[in-house]
């Protein structure tokens, strides 16, 4: 389903290329909208241990590993933008950071396009938060522990603070290694009520 969403943006336009990288980043990292629009070019590390640095709730910084497909997509995007480290990673045509409303419109627009080619998409209301849930579900399907998923998504709880004092990038990389790119399909996974409640709290 999410493969259809990633195919929706028109790759012959600047806006379409930006939107695809934005959607892929959100699907893989599970970042909140506020975290995505706060990303700067300098927050992207594409070398060994490729990751994104973001500032989450409570002004706490964390690092999220990048899968190979996301790393290549971001590398290509940055190559055509010729931006400075302090510039927004995802900007308007005038170089200003995208707003929360703009991101929501982008998701709705391409979800509508995807719905025209995917029958299952027509039944769904896709929002930025749904993309965050999708990232969490992919980790769950891959057998990643819920505590690590909460850590990955920057979700604070008594459980996570007791077990982990600092966000461990190596631990997250191991979790990421268990996941598959969006275009690789697998068996359908249905979480139980307890897991659904956990996802709803993220």
Set out the residue ranges of the language-model regions.
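Conserved catalytic core of the tyrosine transesterase superfamily
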Residues: 1-202
């Amino acid at each position: 389903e999410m493969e259809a969403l990633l195919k929706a943006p028109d790759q012959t336009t600047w806006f379409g290329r930006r939107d695809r990288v934005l959607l892929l980043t959100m699907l893989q990292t599970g970042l909140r909208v506020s975290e995505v629009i706060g990303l700067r070019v300098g927050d992207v590390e594409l070398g060994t241990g490729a990751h994104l640095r973001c500032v989450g709730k409570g002004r706490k910084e964390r690092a999220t590993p990048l899968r190979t497909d996301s790393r290549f997509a971001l590398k290509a995007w940055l190559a055509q933008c010729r931006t400075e480290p302090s510039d927004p990673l995802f900007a308007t045509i005038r170089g200003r950071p995208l707003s929360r409303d703009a991101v929501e419109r982008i998701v709705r627009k391409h979800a509508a396009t995807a719905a025209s080619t995917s029958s299952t998409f027509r039944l769904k209301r896709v929002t930025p938060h749904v993309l965050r849930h999708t990232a969490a579900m992919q980790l769950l399907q891959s057998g990643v522990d819920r505590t690590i998923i909460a850590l990955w998504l920057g979700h604070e709880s008594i459980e996570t603070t007791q077990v982990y004092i600092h966000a461990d990038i190596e631990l997250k990389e191991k979790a990421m290694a268990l996941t598959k790119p969006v275009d690789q399909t697998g068996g359908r996974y249905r979480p139980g009520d307890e897991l659904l409640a956990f996802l709803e709290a993220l």
